[in-house]
């Protein structure tokens, strides 16, 4: 697959697909992975070694991939600009993505919405370019990490950001929310 540059919706709705044999795919030229595994409810393939450094959009990539919980810690996502919905309803995902460079992302809309198992340290994420954090953690019932150091000064929308995030109990009083409408 080394010549492929778009993998949008490749396994979308493939509910029985488990992802066996994907670990050695050369995806280094792929720029789009939107909805790639969306609704692939049994997908839990090892894609930890994928070179995703050319990818610019991961919109809804693992949305409702209920079984997915693989190591993505080594992924270089520095060119990604769109991660909206990426882990929405990914019920099992609780991977370490603390080192992800999300500095080019401007919207965190529904990134962890209903990601019921996710509770990882993302305090070092550079979110200074983000303007939309609406519906980012709703129903993320396990999430309770200290994100007080985030620079949210450019965010204009935080609607429903922690709606139903029943475990979240962190002090975010230092956030500059002066631009939130």
Functional labels for PLM-detected ranges:
Residues 1-181:
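Negatively charged
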């Amino acid at each position: 697959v080394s010549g492929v540059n778009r993998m949008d919706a490749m396994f979308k709705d493939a509910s029985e697909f488990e992802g066996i044999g994907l670990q050695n795919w050369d995806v280094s030229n792929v720029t789009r992975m939107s909805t790639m595994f969306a609704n692939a409810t049994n997908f839990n393939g090892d894609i930890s070694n994928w070179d995703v450094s050319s990818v610019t959009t991961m919109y809804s990539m693992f949305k409702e991939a209920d079984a997915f919980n693989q190591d993505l810690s080594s992924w270089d996502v520095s060119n990604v600009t769109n991660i909206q919905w990426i882990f929405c309803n990914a019920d099992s995902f609780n991977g370490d993505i603390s080192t992800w460079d999300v500095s080019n992302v401007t919207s965190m809309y529904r990134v962890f919405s209903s990601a019921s198992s996710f509770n990882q340290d993302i305090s070092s994420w550079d979110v200074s370019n983000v303007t939309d954090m609406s519906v980012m953690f709703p129903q993320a019932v396990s999430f309770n990490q200290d994100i007080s150091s985030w620079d949210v000064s450019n965010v204009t929308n935080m609607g429903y950001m922690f709606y139903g995030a029943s475990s979240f109990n962190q002090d975010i009083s230092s956030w500059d929310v002066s631009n939130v409408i």
